[in-house]
Amino acid sequence: FHTDFRFVPSENLHITLQFLGDVERAMVPRLLQEIEQSIAHISPFELCLGSASAFPASGRPRVLYIGTGEGSRRLAQLARSVRRALSAMGFKEDKPFKSHITLARRKRGAGSFGALDERNAWQEAFAGREKPGLCWQVSEVLLMESTLYPTGAVYTQLGRVALPGGQ
């Protein structure tokens, strides 16, 4: 089961508020300024892990993820604020925000499991392992660059905006 998926290295685990695509480096200061203004009304909050699941909702899963639990509404508010500001700059997001941390992606050309229901296998693998007490403080928004390589993505921090009252 696990050989058909490429797991995300722990240092790359993150929640994407909005994917921007290719961005000129000269735009980074303005992006950070717009993000800062858009989140000025949002204070730091606690976010907890939720349940494991997979995308898409039907058929063979391509992405294995863990959702968020307590604090998800505050995270959605943060995402809405950031997306609204970036949309005004011309960065349109065609997918609705789905709060999740990607754990693994199906490798290209990965085989089928035949009669095995992959989705149930994934959920059974994580049954009872959710950590509802695993929480952390959301105190900043990072602007990250993602460079894709055959071995996976490499992330570089381009900037950071603290939530008011955050570090």
Task: List each model region and its residues.
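Histidine-dependent nucleotide/RNA phosphoesterase domain, centered on the 2H-phosphoesterase fold
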Residues: 1-167
